[in-house]
Amino acid sequence: RRGARQARGPLTQDRIQQYRIRYILAKLTQYVEEQAWGNPAYGRIDHYIAEKVEIEHILPANPRPDVRDAFDKLQEYATHVGRLVNLTLLEKTINGSVRNGSFKDKASGYKQSSFLLTKSLVEKPQVGVNTQLNRAVAELIQFGRWNSAAIQKRQEMLAKLARKVWAMPEEEGETVR
């Protein structure tokens, strides 16, 4: 329990080594893929931590001035950028085209991602009725914009997902930051 207490606090790129952030994102992404496709090929974690996959900042780390100024809580911008909730895995080729744009600018790139956790930021894939894919993405949230309220909602969603991935009991008032 001592280790769990030490881990509390925001999960940010400043507090946690990059390879650990990548691993956490990979496990979350892998879980969704396995639930959706039921394919053992998705069991290999190296698929998600390969050199062809990058950590994408949804709220850009180096934004254009117009992107930064459009954020609803400008004074909190820097604190949100490195948080786990603001990160997602994205194929390197797609990430190169969306780099420092607004969420609206990045949406078309996210839709092209093969990772359901990333794709679902803007579009929740559906196939038929009550299919394995639909059940896998049911609790994922899509967003029309990326502001402080969206960040809070995704934080709650990722916390629920993390509890499933690591078979953790739900503790009242605890969320992934």
Which functions belong to the PLM regions below?
Residues H80-R83, L87-R177:
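Long, cytosolic, alpha-helical-rich C-terminal regions that act as interaction/scaffolding modules
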